[in-house]
Amino acid sequence: MNHIRNFSIIAHIDHGKSTLSDRIIQICGGLSEREMAAQVLDSMDLERERGITIKAQSVTLDYHSKDGQTYQLNFIDTPGHVDFSYEVSRSLAACEGALLVVDAGQGVEAQTLANCYTAMEMDLEVVPVLNKIDLPAADPERVAEEIEDIVGIDATDAIRCSAKTGVGVPDVLERLVRDIPAPEGDPNGPLQALIIDSWFDNYLGVVSLIRIKNGSLRKGDKVKVMSTGQSYNADRLGIFTPKRVDRDVLNCGEVGWLVCAIKDILGAPVGDTLTLTRNPAEKSLPGFKKVKPQVYAGLFPISSDDYESFRDALGKLSLNDASLFYEPESSTALGFGFRCGFLGLLHMEIIQERLEREYDLELITTAPTVVYEVITTNQETVYVDSPSKLPALNNIEELREPIAECHMLLPQEYLGNVITLCIEKRGTQTNMVYHGKQVALTYEIPMAEVVLDFFDRLKSTSRGYASLDYNFKRFQTSDMVRVDVLINNERVDALALITHRDNAQYRGRDLVEKMKELIPRQQFDIAIQAAIGNHIIARSTVKQLRKNVLAKCYGGDVSRKKKLLQKQKDGKKRMKQVGNVELPQEAFLAILHVGKDSK
């Protein structure tokens, strides 16, 4: 046990976590030269293409230290994006220490802070590492000061390395072995194993990643899931050296994988505790706090035959991604689908892409909304996550919208731009601190504005230098209204949006104009209107296609022309009564871009 070290690698996006893990695997000989690839742990195609880590991955390696002893390193590579911070906190729960990787050129960014505080709250030993010292722009001295200044941990002897070239990585390993404490636990006590992550394998059923806190687990043992009380056989277990390797026993303090032939997706929820049936532990380990989705959107299969396979796919995906929430929903325009909850827009995009790729589905997404708290006139509190569920205006006593607390770190010269952006997003400033050349800004901004396009706009207004970390703060009363879209006097539920009254007119007009471009012309006029309640705030018309019925009258009598035009008009009128308008997929996505290009 004294020779086991469990640690995670945490950092801001693109500070070199995955590259550092590659080097560590290489030095410890986890993979042969031939099998080595860049970002070996990013196993999803999607992760490779976007160059980001989405799922935390674990690896077990043997490290021969300079003091002549062999240590077993279990480490977990974690994502850096704010949408996946839940993955990070889960990975940290399985560790005794964390490597805080900071880019020596970029310096401390918002996610560095957020992840580091998460680690400190869990009482982990944080080892700072300055990465990318081979860059011409690197300034390790300044960054070490920044770490002490902003994060508040001692960085005077922070290790300097370059994960790309491999310089300094052996020092990182030595420091790990020296500074990170060995796991504590009772090897002879009753088994307690924490489920860190699980995913669905088509051949094996549910595969779980577990950290053994007390006791040990042998192949063939009967294990019990503590929350459900169900018992299973431990058929196979082992470790990742990134490859799956079978073992006969997992000892106290180790991290490994386990297959129990669980077919039911909800059989072993993440954050649960496993114990032995014959000698069960008294109480379960403290799990993880449940995360609440911040953004909701409707997902609908394009062809309704896919509904069943879509449901299965969501089930399997939610096993792998504990923060995904979904419930069935039906829409008059789009048929049957699911209302899904996500942690942010990136999360939503990734889930949609994974569904389309891994499960071969074609999906339509409706506009994302946040959760509103509504007090009705008979004093009930309801939570509304979709515009169509919002009660009628005269039944609403007050409507409260979620406010996010946003922490931003940015260079001084972009301060003006960023403040302008925050004010435009209805934000109020709560704090501002200068650290050297960096400014730490704290704003309270409505969640609806943050999830819409705040991150993109922040990046573009600060040339990519500003970084953002946000969390839900509270609900606050606000004057929000629902803007409905009517096409030929019929409401289209999938196009409704909830917005602030001040922006409603402008958003409504923008949406109507966008729809006008996207709806193909028909044989009759199509009226597109935006309305708040019964009050129409914007309208535009998609003009009809019409034949030139006068082409055959050379010269000729005006009454003859009138008769032909009148006949055409009557025909169009009849057509309009029976005709219905097919909306193209782009029309539903138009909402996402309202207010982006025009400002």
From Swiss-Prot:
PROSITE patterns: G_TR_1, G_TR_2
Primary localization: membrane
Keyword field: Cell inner membrane, Cell membrane, GTP-binding, Hydrolase, Membrane, Nucleotide-binding, Protein biosynthesis
EC annotation from Swiss-Prot or TrEMBL: 3.6.5.n1
Gene Ontology terms, MF aspect: GTP binding; GTPase activity; guanosine tetraphosphate binding; ribosome binding; translation elongation factor activity
Bilayer topology: Peripheral membrane protein
EC top class, as a word: hydrolase
GO cellular component, one term: plasma membrane
Signal sequence coordinates: none
InterPro entries per the UniProt record, alphabetical: EF-4 (IPR006297), EFG_III/V (IPR035647), EFG_V-like (IPR000640), EFTu-like_2 (IPR004161), G_TR_CS (IPR031157), LepA_C_sf (IPR038363), LepA_CTD (IPR013842), LepA_IV (IPR035654)
Regions that span the bilayer: none
Reaction(s) the record says it catalyses: GTP + H2O = GDP + phosphate + H(+)
GO terms, biological process: positive regulation of translation
UniProt-annotated binding residues for GTP: D14, H15, G16, K17, S18, T19, N131, K132, I133, D134
SUPFAM superfamilies: EF-G C-terminal domain-like, P-loop containing nucleoside triphosphate hydrolases
Protein's cellular compartments: Cell inner membrane
Residue ranges annotated for the tr-type G domain, each copy included: 2-184
Coiled coil residues, start to end: none
CDD domains xrefs: EF4_II, EF4_III, LepA, lepA_C
Function: Required for accurate and efficient protein synthesis under certain stress conditions. May act as a fidelity factor of the translation reaction, by catalyzing a one-codon backward translocation of tRNAs on improperly translocated ribosomes. Back-translocation proceeds from a post-translocation (POST) complex to a pre-translocation (PRE) complex, thus giving elongation factor G a second chance to translocate the tRNAs correctly. Binds to ribosomes in a GTP-dependent manner.
PANTHER family: TRANSLATION FACTOR GUF1 HOMOLOG, CHLOROPLASTIC, TRANSLATION FACTOR GUF1-RELATED
Family: Belongs to the TRAFAC class translation factor GTPase superfamily. Classic translation factor GTPase family. LepA subfamily.
Protein name: Elongation factor 4
